Every structure is written in structure tokens, then in C-alpha cells.
From Swiss-Prot:
Taxonomic source organism: Escherichia coli (strain K12)
Protein known as: Dipeptide transport ATP-binding protein DppF
Origin organism lineage: Bacteria, Pseudomonadati, Pseudomonadota, Gammaproteobacteria, Enterobacterales
GO cellular component: ATP-binding cassette (ABC) transporter complex, substrate-binding subunit-containing; membrane
Annotated residues for binding of ATP: 55-62
Superkingdom: Bacteria
Any one Gene Ontology molecular-function term assigned to this protein's record: heme transmembrane transporter activity
Effect of disrupting the coding gene: Inactivation of the gene abolishes use of heme as an iron source.
Catalytic activity: a dipeptide(out) + ATP + H2O = a dipeptide(in) + ADP + phosphate + H(+)
């Protein structure tokens, strides 16, 4: 097998047991405690596919996005791009991270420098990371603007002169200027009007087909996720509780938390009715999580081991679920 063939068989992006713990002290003499914002998350992202990461605010999904782009460094775990270790502190790994993994932020009003024109915003990554001439940078910026539906005359305008949807198109174009393979999309449409969300989503899907992009799509909106995802990872308090294909998650959710999230999602078909599952209480504090399963205080299927032990992901026909109740359903004799 050639080196190229071996590379193509590897996941494009692979995370193994990624962790991010923040030390916290409440007073000068208080003992240091840890907030486990991310606590052992693993996944494989294949070329040209979209992995959606979903969950309530505070579940750790945005922290995961920051780790994947090295905005923050993980406390532990491993991260590979086509088999190459991205956590090595060497110039080659850093260059690879900058060029091959880019991010599109949630807020198009805050992520663009108001003092710079669109052309300057788009050319800045090229100015920092390439040796292209001024004319070459301009040519590439105009080409990318056309790809995202912006006009040539927009090149010399400032961000405040655009609508929210147009600003997010600028942000997407900026994220693609270095020809990345992976784009981390952190709630890319949540700050937009409903009327333009579908346009931006369709643009992202068209760009994925045209450029062969892979997305890690972070969202709390399952109706949006259903439109764009190939695989879905459900997170709760820093951990993955369920992972599977889009069809598995939406048609046969196994974890009680996933079931509750989906029951709250509006359906287009009025005949497609689900039992409304109402969760009691709020997301626990990551500074003081409950013993056992972090979801046990809100779970309607809680029983003995849920309050004592932390469930691990188990494979049920290709669908990974971390739940003692599901395990009991599959193995009632235990």
C-alpha cells in the first residue's frame, strides 16, 4: 500500500479522549477545583462529511471547537490530521493547523474587524501565511467572494454596510482563504434571521460539494442539524452521551437526553408526533457535577447504578450510547 493510499484510508481528523479542565479558586485559601469543560471526547471525521455536535449551552461543544482550532490547548488527549499529530509543538504542525483547519464563528457582527474593508479581511490570512503578491491576494479574494455570493463592488466596503447574512458570507469566505480541508462551524446561523438561515446553510452545503470540505458543525438547533449533518454527536456536561448517523439519531434516539432534545424540536409533518419529554431542573454546574451519570438528576429512567457509576459509551449496532438504562434494555438478564 502506498503512502498516499494509507493517508486516504485514515480519518481526515481524529480526536482521541480530548479533555479541557480549567482550574478554579473561589478564595485565597480555598482549595483549587477543576471545571471539566470537556472530559474525554473522541470522534473521527471523514473527508467530505459533516459531524454535528449538539447539546444545551454549557455542554462543552464550543470548547471542543476551540480545541480543534488550537485557540485553546487541550489538557489531555490526542488530535490527528491525516495521521499527523497536531499537538506537537513544532513549526510544521502549527503551519498545518493554520492552513488545514479553520473556524467560522457564531456572531458575524463581532467576528469581523469593523475598521477593515472586506478585501483586507479576506486577504489577511494570505498575507500572514503565504508569499502571494498583492495582485494574487486580491485575485483570490475576489474569486472567493464570488463563490459565497458577494459582488466585486463589495471588496472595498466595510462590514457595517452589510446585512447579517452577508456578513456571515464574508466570515465563511475568510475561513476558506487558505484552502482548508476542515471547517469548524460554531453556531454559524444561530445569530441570523430565520429567513436567511436556509440560504447560508445551502451555501455551506454547496461549498462542501464544490471544495470537498469536511465540517464540524456545532449547534443547539436540531432542525438545522437534520438539514446538514451526516453524523451527530450529542454532548452533555463535557461528555459524549450518544453518537451515530443522522438517521440513527433522528429516527431511533436511544439516550434519554437525546430523546428529550428531539421531542422539543418542531416537526414539519403534523402527523409525525413525538411524546413531549420535559426535563426537570437545569444543567448541573460543571464545578459540582452529580455523582454517577451527570444526567441522572434530570433523567426519567434513572435507577440504581446511575447515581453511583459513570456510564461509558457502548456500541449498539453502530450507534454509541452511554446509558445504563439502554444497556439494561439490550441485556435484560443482567
Amino acid at each position: 500500500m502506498s503512502t498516499q493510499e494509507a493517508t486516504l484510508q485514515q480519518p481526515l481528523l481524529q480526536a482521541i479522549d480530548l479533555k479541557k479542565h480549567y482550574p478554579v479558586k473561589k478564595g485565597m485559601f480555598a482549595p483549587e477545583r477543576l471545571v471539566k469543560a470537556l472530559d474525554g471526547v473522541s470522534f473521527n471525521l471523514e473527508r467530505g462529511k459533516t459531524l454535528a455536535v449538539v447539546g444545551e449551552s454549557g455542554c462543552g461543544k464550543s470548547t471542543l471547537g476551540r480545541l480543534l482550532t488550537m485557540i485553546e490547548m487541550p489538557t489531555g488527549g490526542e488530535l490527528y490530521y491525516q495521521g499527523q499529530d497536531l499537538l506537537k509543538h513544532d513549526p510544521q504542525a502549527q503551519k498545518l493547523r493554520r492552513q488545514k483547519i479553520q473556524i467560522v464563528f457564531q456572531n458575524p457582527y463581532g467576528s469581523l474587524n469593523p475598521r477593515k474593508k472586506v478585501g483586507q479581511i479576506l486577504e489577511e490570512p494570505l498575507l500572514i501565511n503565504t508569499s502571494l503578491s498583492k495582485e494574487q491576494r486580491r485575485e483570490k479574494a475576489l474569486s472567493m467572494m464570488a463563490k459565497v455570493g458577494l459582488k466585486t463592488e463589495h471588496y472595498d466596503r466595510y462590514p457595517h454596510m452589510f446585512s447579517g447574512g452577508q456578513r456571515q458570507r464574508i466570515a465563511i469566505a475568510r475561513g476558506l482563504m487558505l484552502d482548508p480541508d476542515v471547517v469548524i462551524a460554531d453556531e454559524p446561523v444561530s445569530a441570523l434571521d430565520v429567513s436567511v438561515r436556509a440560504q447560508v446553510l445551502n451555501l455551506m452545503m454547496d461549498l462542501q460539494q464544490e471544495l470537498g470540505l469536511s465540517y464540524v458543525f456545532i449547534s443547539h438547533d436540531l432542525s438545522v442539524v437534520e438539514h446538514i449533518a451526516d453524523e451527530v454527536m450529542v454532548m452533555y456536561l463535557g461528555r459524549c452521551v450518544e453518537k451515530g448517523t443522522k438517521d440513527q439519531i433522528f429516527n431511533n434516539p436511544r439516550h434519554p437526553y437525546t430523546q428529550a432534545l428531539l421531542s422539543a424540536t418542531p416537526r414539519l409533518n403534523p402527523d409525525d408526533r413525538r411524546e413531549r419529554i420535559k426535563l426537570s431542573g437545569e444543567l448541573p454546574s460543571p464545578l459540582n457535577p452529580p455523582p454517577g451519570c451527570a444526567f441522572n438528576a434530570r433523567c426519567r429512567r434513572r435507577f440504581g447504578p446511575c447515581t453511583q457509576l459513570q456510564p461509558q459509551l457502548k456500541d449498539y449496532g453502530g450507534q454509541l450510547v452511554a446509558c445504563f438504562a439502554v444497556d439494561q434494555d439490550e441485556n435484560p438478564q443482567r
